[in-house]
Design a protein with these regions (language model features):
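Short glycine-aromatic motifs
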Residues: 1-2, 42-44, 109-114
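Acyl-donor-binding surface of acyltransferase catalytic domains
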Residues: 70-133
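An N-terminal domain-start capping segment
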Residues: 4-35, 80-104
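A cross-taxonomic marker for long C-terminal extensions/tails that follow the last structured domain
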Residues: 163-170
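Short amphipathic alpha-helix that is part of the acyltransferase structural core
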Residues: 1-31, 118, 130-162
Length: 178
């Protein structure tokens, strides 16, 4: 297992897999700010196999597993080889429509269990939004970052939600988004 030291390394993994022209399958979607923070903190690692890269985001609370590969068959073969290398608890997020059932089965067959199944919904049409002037409500500041983090961990499950880190919260605060 090797540490990822730049976003360019991740882009090279994507290019490697796409250049094979055998298909492209991933659960990793690049977020430049978030993933740069993971790299700076030394939390992002990879293991490479033929036709497949596994990326691991390792933290004190949750280990997230991501993959970049060609097909679900290739994923299954390489997952069998990968699991003995990293025997700690891992969380895998799989996002998609009904077609991902086969992908879910790849992980279940290797001993993973479904922890949470979420459904995303959208609304057609515009949502009426009324801005209400509330004098006692204001945007959070840097000194509030730990409280925001504590609230997120109190009300959301870190195993089923990818909660932001303290550094990500500071970034959102700087944008006046909280």
């Amino acid at each position: 297992m090797d540490k990822i030291d730049s976003l360019d390394k991740i882009n090279a993994f994507v290019s490697d897999i796409r250049s094979l022209r055998k298909g492209y399958l991933t659960n990793f979607f690049l977020d430049r700010k978030k993933h740069s923070l993971w790299i700076e903190k030394g939390e992002l690692f990879y293991v490479s196999f033929p036709d497949c890269y596994f990326l691991l985001h390792l933290t004190n609370s949750v280990n997230n597993l991501f993959f970049i590969t060609t097909t679900s068959q290739q994923l299954a073969e390489n997952l069998k080889a990968f699991l003995p290398i990293f025997a700690e608890q891992m969380v895998v997020d799989i996002v998609g429509d009904a077609k991902i059932v086969d992908l879910k089965d790849v992980f279940v067959e290797q001993g993973f269990s479904v922890y949470e199944q979420l459904y995303r919904m959208n609304r057609i049409g515009t949502l009426e939004f009324k801005e209400i002037d509330t004098p006692n409500v204001c945007f959070a500041e840097d000194v509030d970052a730990q409280v925001v983090l504590d609230m997120l961990h109190s009300y959301f499950d870190p195993l089923s939600e990818q909660l932001p880190s303290y550094e990500e919260i500071l970034y959102f605060l700087s944008l006046i988004h909280i």
